[in-house]
Amino acid sequence: MERPQLPQGLPADIEDKKAAAKAWFESLRDTICAAFEAIEDELTGPLSDRPAGRFVAKDWLREEGAGGGGRMSMMEGRVFEKVGVHTSTVFGEFSPEFREQIPGASEDPRFWASGISLIAHPVNPNVPAVHMNTRMVVTTSNWFGGGADLTPVLDRRRIMTDPDTVLFHRAMEIACNRHPVADHAKFKQWCDEYFYLKHRNEPRGTGGIFYDWLRSAEELGGWDADFAFTRDVGKAFALVYPRIVRTNFNKPWTEQDRNEQLVRRGRYVEFNLLYDRGTIFGLKTGGNVESILSSLPPLVRWP
């Protein structure tokens, strides 16, 4: 007899909750991909003589002995030099070395996880890079996590008073303030602390929000409230980042701007390979390596 996919003792409606979360992540993926393709069509500034980019979707399954898979959607265009919008739903058992790091996994190593992950590296250095992900994880416990953060690549724009950063933070603050289960000040600080390159003593970007292990008490709305907040994070991102791109994507840039962008991308590589929790989680749970490492920029420079 096959072992059950999940530990015993979970809520009776856990399968309905899993299905709802998975459906939302996939719907958000389609919404964002359509929005980014529309932006590709709208470019009139530098490089507008190039063809507009389109996403190429590739489904994948986990390696033999593991369960689940996902869809990797990649685009290389005239606005987005490289952008990936990925969804995955995976299940199996955590390795012994990983169990102590995941809530509920030390009691039973079985897990289920579903989520969306996005990273965009624009062509124009005036357009900030961005990252967003949200996820639901089930072990003997279950919770939501995720966030969104902005990375301007020009030093003169890596300030908290820059209009793009102000707009991005305001969008995340509004999303948080709509939900009693969310704490914007806490999530903003968590983002600043998480997306920090310790070996260089500098932040990766200008921040956003980051949250994990969100499992609210029933009196606050429980799972439904956490899921509603997680959906609003995705909706807020899908509105604010295209607006930021449209504000900047037709602006001219210099060779110095491009060099600055490539150096800043190098910092992005350093963070993702040294510190990023999602990268480590994916590689240690039999995730799709191509999808996991697709967050890395196409061209970088170390001075």
UniProtKB/Swiss-Prot annotation:
PROSITE patterns: COPROGEN_OXIDASE (PS01021). GO terms for biological process: protoporphyrinogen IX biosynthetic process. The keyword Nuclease does not apply. Substrate binds at S117, N133, T134, R135, G286, G287, N288. Keywords: Cytoplasm, Heme biosynthesis, Metal-binding, Oxidoreductase, Porphyrin biosynthesis. The active site is at H131 (proton donor). Its cofactor is a divalent metal cation. It comes from Rhizobium meliloti (strain 1021) (Ensifer meliloti). HAMAP family: Coprogen_oxidas. Its EC number is 1.3.3.3. Pfam families: Coprogen_oxidas. Signal peptide: none annotated. This is Oxygen-dependent coproporphyrinogen-III oxidase. It is found in: Cytoplasm. Pathway: Porphyrin-containing compound metabolism; protoporphyrin-IX biosynthesis; protoporphyrinogen-IX from coproporphyrinogen-III (O2 route): step 1/1. Belongs to the aerobic coproporphyrinogen-III oxidase family. PANTHER family: COPROPORPHYRINOGEN III OXIDASE, MITOCHONDRIAL (PTHR10755), OXYGEN-DEPENDENT COPROPORPHYRINOGEN-III OXIDASE, MITOCHONDRIAL (PTHR10755:SF0). It comes from the Bacteria. Residues 268-303 are annotated as: Important for dimerization. GO terms for molecular function: coproporphyrinogen oxidase activity; metal ion binding; protein homodimerization activity. InterPro entries: Coprogen_oxidase_aer, Coprogen_oxidase_aer_sf, Coprogen_oxidase_CS. Homodimer. A divalent metal cation binds at H121, H131, H169, H199. Its main location: cytoplasm. Involved in the heme biosynthesis. Catalyzes the aerobic oxidative decarboxylation of propionate groups of rings A and B of coproporphyrinogen-III to yield the vinyl groups in protoporphyrinogen-IX. GO terms for cellular component: cytoplasm. It catalyses: coproporphyrinogen III + O2 + 2 H(+) = protoporphyrinogen IX + 2 CO2 + 2 H2O.
